[in-house]
Amino acid sequence: MTTHVAPQAKDWYQAKDSDTGYQKVIGYMPAAHGLTLAQNDIIQMVKVGIGTIITDVILLTGAMGSSVTADVGDVTNGESIYISAADVSGNSITYMESVDLVGVPFTYTVADTIDVHFEAATPASDQAFSLIVGYITGVDITP
């Protein structure tokens, strides 16, 4: 298992600074970035700041390979998983609205990334996938 970082998740990348908006990583193809994916690889896709609430998550994929599934969220520590075990073996669109899988909005208390985790089989590195994340920022998290 390897963790890869998409350009939008790197330290130097500045996310939109409005109170609400969408962060998009469109047409990310691992092979175009010199990557060969393996089963259980994680790709950090979008940076999120302190006080961010995620409102929507959309994952679009090409045919990632037989039996491949994907999780989307903070997959390294499991605090917020927005899409779980989505079948991405063929072309797919998976959408999550408003809340993570535990049923309540998750507010980030530290800066983090939203990741895509390919499971169950080795995903195709020559297939593009896109992640669109809707968010609200500037939420006051002080008690």
PLM-predicted stretches and their roles:
Residues 2-143:
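Surface-exposed, low-hydrophobicity beta-strand/loop segments enriched in small/polar/acidic residues
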